[in-house]
Amino acid sequence: MNETLIRAYYAAYNALDADGLAGLLAPDVELVSAMGTQTGRDAYLETYRTMTGLFTDVMTPEQIAVNGDTVTVTIHDSLTAKADIADFMGQSLKAGEELVLRLQGQYTFRDGRIARIAITPLA
């Protein structure tokens, strides 16, 4: 069940389906990432819209490990700048330039929805 929800999450994320994402998230979802900690569905969606406004952002789950209510995902994240970006995570990018990140996402589920997301870089 949780693997199905994770696959739906990535499908919605990559399809720019904010409503689909919202339906998968708990109202008080917590997102912890390089951009800090956001709490609540609206805060998550604001971060999502910021990222997808700056980049064509395609996240591909490479490995999915389910352990009860926690799912750990190894992610290949391809970010292509839509315009020149002076500073993103300490880097400047020109329009059309791609940044590839290897990430780990840890997703915690509660009542059939994603309640916590922690995204960390992999070496």
Where are these regions (language model features)?
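A beta-strand edge to alpha-helix "cap/lid" segment located at domain peripheries
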Residues: M1, R49-A123
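Short, aromatic-enriched amphipathic alpha-helices that serve as compact interaction elements
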Residues: M1-L16
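Short, well-ordered alpha-helical segments enriched in acidic and aromatic residues
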Residues: L5, D17-D28, V32
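Hydrophobic pocket/interface hotspot
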Residues: Y9, G20-L21, V29, G40, ...
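Structured beta->alpha junctions
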Residues: Y10, S33-G36, Q63-A65
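Short alpha-helical functional segments enriched in proximate histidine and acidic residues
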Residues: A12, G20, L54
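Short, flexible segments with low predicted structural confidence
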Residues: A15-L16, G23, T37, A43, ...
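A short gly/proline-enriched turn/hairpin at secondary-structure junctions
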Residues: D28-T39, M51-L54
